[in-house]
């Protein structure tokens, strides 16, 4: 694959991945924990959920800011990806403690701990100048 085409493919993949934190972050800021169903929530839980949703949305903005000049955004992408992986490790820890989230959360876990590191490795390949 030509370098320009591979770069555009990585940009498209990252842009697609940004839809999750942007979409779910925004939905969580608006709906609070009601977005995942369940019973009544106290004001503190609602506030905390909205705050974390705002952080999630912000992380999506940081990732989206890497798309236009993906080859030059190594440090920014790695920091953001590190936050995603850390969140995935927290989710995995909950799973190990007996939490039984929905299938959607299992898919998110796979993306956080599988897809995210692969995107970082792919970006490192794109950021490296081709050998002469």
Segments from the language model and where they lie:
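Alpha-helical transmembrane segments of multipass membrane proteins
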Residues: 26, 63-64, 91-93, 117
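Cytosolic juxtamembrane helix and N-cap/initiation of the first transmembrane helix
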Residues: 1-20
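Non-cytosolic membrane-interface motifs at loop->transmembrane helix junctions
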Residues: 39-46, 100-111
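Core segments of alpha-helical transmembrane spans in multipass integral membrane proteins
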Residues: 19, 23-27, 45-67, 82-86
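Membrane-water interface at the C-terminal end of transmembrane alpha helices
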Residues: 114-132
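Short membrane-interface helical motifs at transmembrane helix boundaries
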Residues: 26-36
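Membrane-interfacial loop-to-transmembrane alpha-helix junctions, especially the N-terminal start
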Residues: 72-83
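Membrane-helix boundary connector in multi-pass membrane proteins
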Residues: 89-106, 124
